[in-house]
């Protein structure tokens, strides 16, 4: 029987681009694990994606996951847009390369062994776990220690 996990994620950026951070809360039964990391130069969308990737990569076995995020970009990308991107050799409908392709590929790889129910939550609306993730992401952004490998300045 696969473990049922709840994951809440958020990304933050001080300036866009600027220093960024990720926050995640993983819950299994009564156990909670919190993640917070900061990156020197990045974008908000990259942090939203990286928060999910980092959270999923902490899991040691395939799980049944309900994943909550306030990022429509991440949710629509992984549940709708990615299928055409992959078919079109990572080109957007405009014909231009998909932005943040490195992280979309990493996210696509990290979801393969799990069954995920994707849920959008309204940000800054009093959702307890989303508020915690927001704080964790801001903390990370305020104390960056990592390079966001793959970030390309526009």
Curated annotation (Swiss-Prot):
GO terms for biological process: DNA replication, removal of RNA primer. Its main location: cytoplasm. Transmembrane segments: none annotated. CDD domains: RNase_HI_prokaryote_like (cd09278). Mg(2+) 2 binds at residues 10, 134. It catalyses: Endonucleolytic cleavage to 5'-phosphomonoester. Residues 1-142 form the RNase H type-1 domain. Keywords: Cytoplasm, Endonuclease, Hydrolase, Magnesium, Metal-binding, Nuclease. Its EC number is 3.1.26.4. It holds the Pfam family RNase_H. Endonuclease that specifically degrades the RNA of RNA-DNA hybrids. Belongs to the RNase H family. This is Ribonuclease H. It comes from Haemophilus influenzae (strain PittGG). The gene is rnhA.
